[in-house]
Amino acid sequence: MSFQSRLGCRWVRFYVKRKPPGEAALVEFTRRRFRTPGWLVWYHSLGAKIERIERPVKGEWVSSRRHSRADGVIYYLHGGGYISGSAKSCRPITVTLARHSGARVFALDYRLAPEHHFPAGLDDTAAGYRWLLANGIDPRSIAVAGDSAGGGMTLALALQLREANEPLPGCLVCLSPWTDMTSGSDSLRENSARDSMFVAEDIERYASAYLGDHSRRDPLASPLLANLQGLPPILIQVGREEVLLDDARNLHANVHAAGGSSVLHIYEDVPHGWHYGAPFVPETGEALREAANFIRTRIQT
């Protein structure tokens, strides 16, 4: 474990692990504590070109001023438990991916719960993907990527496209994905003490805020429970001490059982959300370079 990762684990545990009771308090706490500091957003904007889009979808284009090319596109879906986060807050990831891959990144602002329950955010995600296609982007040149809740939504989007017989992207990248809302995995209990950010009860509370009364077994909410045949190649990254470890491991196993292609990399001694640590955490740089390399070799340009 690097010094930076060790420090990050301690900071996350102190700052965000203990959450207040009640849904309204949880939402306020998450949106305040998970907000990317303004100085870090500014820092990552250096050397990048940012173009804000407000309609017909909301989000931002991110490209590297020095390494951009016009063909490949990464469609990025931010994390935040479906109740927080934004295209701006995930800029540490999107700018780094743009720099390492040379692709343009479109980060979507989708509607958040509990103001907008499932499937509002997923509907926005599908609309954003179709908007990319309507602008002449070849689906085979698109990588869909996301972290945490965004990783689960990445899979849900691919499942929705497959069922509708719409063009699939060239590949998927799932960073610490949340794929199962039924709270049935062993790692939820076994890693509750070790995970720097979450305990099992947190996952239950975020699921309730997102779904309301909707079934947690809906495969578009819990894509781990879906038929995973016919999906694009997938890269999965997760930390060994995360409560979401089994969400990632079981996804990898189920994709292979369905005849698909999946690469799983389990990182040691990193907190959930370590992908936001660029450029200060060495493990973050390693993970995002791996993701960029995976994307470069699997999208058609």
What are the functions of these language-model segments?
Residues 1-67, 300-301:
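A glycine/proline-hinged amphipathic helix-loop "lid/cap" segment
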Residues 50-301:
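Alpha/beta-hydrolase superfamily serine-hydrolase fold, recognizing
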